[in-house]
């Protein structure tokens, strides 16, 4: 998740993902050189948070909450079934 320490939407997304036991890797745009450039290249968006589950771009906080409301977030976090 690309984020900043002062972003309320980032905090909301972080809390939800932590409550799900997700292995959360945060990239703070204020602390990591070139992180914003990388985020925009990967997501084509300039706002934070930008959330990826694996390599899949989920979107921002609103999209994450929509996935949770639709009952789809847990299966995304669990990953694909073993083959």
Where are these regions (language model features)?
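Local sequence-structure signature of Cys/Sec-based thiol-disulfide redox active-site neighborhoods
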Residues: 1-23
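Structural alpha/beta surface segment adjacent to cysteine/selenocysteine redox centers
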Residues: 20-23, 36-48, 52-58, 62
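Thioredoxin-like thiol-disulfide oxidoreductase module
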Residues: 29-46, 72-83
């Amino acid at each position: 998740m690309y984020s900043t320490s002062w972003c309320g939407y980032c905090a909301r997304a972080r809390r939800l993902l932590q409550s799900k036991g997700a292995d959360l890797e945060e990239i703070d745009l204020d602390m990591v050189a070139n992180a914003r450039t990388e985020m925009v290249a990967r997501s084509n968006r300039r706002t934070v948070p930008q959330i990826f589950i694996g390599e899949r771009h989920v979107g921002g906080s609103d999209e994450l909450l929509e996935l949770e409301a639709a009952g789809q977030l847990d299966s995304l976090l669990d990953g694909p079934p073993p083959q």
